[in-house]
């Protein structure tokens, strides 16, 4: 799952954050992209916790996205499972962006215009790449490629 822990959730050592810290502080990267995708096994585990019962590391990791699941559960509507999964997958990407901003050294660079954060979502079945637009508060089509045959869950 495309997850980044919040500063309060990161443990030492945290491989995700060590890579991001190195890129930001030593390589002076100007962009961080968090990209989720359809048919995400991590989000499936979050939405169907029985599928990862007893798998402590996986449970803890996908738990980072639990606010996305909580928001999804609070929504009313009769969306099918595929739509619900997509909402949760997209929500997890946005949570990761928020979590990145919980690190002062990232928030400072974003505020100063030295670093930009991007949220992308790739629909494997349709071959569509979406980018989150803060203006519309939605994921908008950025690019279309060939469809990929994947198993529907």
Predicted regions and their residues:
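Divalent-metal-activated hydrolytic enzyme cores
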Residues: 2-30, 41-153
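Conserved functional hotspot residues or short segments at active or partner-binding sites
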Residues: 34
